[in-house]
């Protein structure tokens, strides 16, 4: 893993859940509980059966939704509306985060396996929705999820990232296996370190350029090392 970051970027691509907000906030725990609840209610499974189905679908398809669509023919819109129907009082206006994002050179995007509606609610709650050029959600990728390589091809096209701009683009994500396709395409990659994803990290460490405990730490490193638009400034990761 590289220890010196000395590029400025034209495109900053951010995952949403557990990346834009800290995994410690606990919001995704509530979403996870809703996923299990949905499977229990719609497929008439016990909690244990539902969790087993979740695990199997995630391992096989990379996203629980994809597996449920293919093997159980569930309605994806109904599913997304159900699992994202959670309150998020833990998310508040983040003035410093907004300033840090605003100070980044280049364009900023959200690339998520969740829905656009969910993404907009999260960004709005944190007061940072205006910092992003575009959101690419699971519906816009025709339900082809990360880490499917086809999803990344759709992402590059959707964000208008040309082949000669890929190496000037960076992807920040908490799910380590989702960084591999981005790295293979030529993007720089940043992993938001978390215990939930350690096994994936071990399997995909070679595809990760930098790792940080949270987004604020990553952006603070850029700020304190005097990031200047149009110039290359080096900084070390934590």
Residue ranges and their predicted role:
Residues 22, 110-112, 191:
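Hydrophobic residues in well-ordered beta-strands that form the structural core
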Residues 47-49, 102-107, 163-165:
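Short, surface-exposed connector motifs at secondary-structure boundaries
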Residues 67, 100-103, 181:
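Well-formed, non-transmembrane alpha-helical positions, independent of function
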Residues 3-96, 117:
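N-terminal helical cap/lid subdomain that shapes the substrate entry/recognition surface
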Residues 93, 111, 144:
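Residue-level marker of regulatory loop/turn positions in helix-turn-helix DNA-binding domains and
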Residues 1-9, 116, 120-238:
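Asp-based, Mg2+/Mn2+-dependent phosphohydrolase catalytic module
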Residues 78-89, 97-126, 132-138:
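Substrate-recognition element of Asp-dependent hydrolases with the DxDx(T/V) motif
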């Amino acid at each position: 893993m590289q220890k010196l970051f000395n590029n400025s970027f034209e495109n900053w691509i951010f995952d949403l859940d557990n990346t834009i907000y800290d995994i410690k906030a606990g919001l995704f725990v509530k979403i996870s509980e809703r996923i299990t609840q949905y499977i229990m209610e719609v497929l008439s499974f016990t909690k244990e059966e539902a969790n087993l189905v979740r695990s199997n679908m995630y391992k096989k398809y990379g996203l629980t939704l994809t597996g449920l669509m293919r093997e159980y023919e569930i309605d994806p819109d109904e599913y997304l509306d159900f699992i994202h129907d959670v309150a998020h009082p833990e998310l508040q206006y983040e003035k410093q985060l907004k300033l840090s994002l605003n100070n980044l050179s280049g364009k900023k995007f959200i690339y998520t396996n969740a829905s656009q509606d969910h993404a907009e609610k999260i960004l709005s709650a944190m007061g940072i929705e205006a910092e992003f050029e575009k959101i690419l959600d699971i519906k816009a990728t025709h339900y082809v999820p990360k880490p499917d390589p086809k999803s990344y091809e759709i992402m590059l096209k959707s964000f208008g990232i040309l082949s000669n701009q890929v190496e000037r683009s960076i992807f920040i994500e908490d799910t380590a296996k989702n960084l591999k396709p981005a790295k293979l395409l030529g993007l720089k990659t940043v992993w938001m370190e978390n215990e939930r994803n350690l096994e994936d990290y071990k399997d995909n460490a070679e595809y990760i350029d930098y790792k940080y405990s949270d987004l604020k730490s990553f952006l603070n490193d850029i700020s304190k090392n005097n990031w200047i638009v149009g110039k290359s400034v080096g900084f070390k990761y934590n």
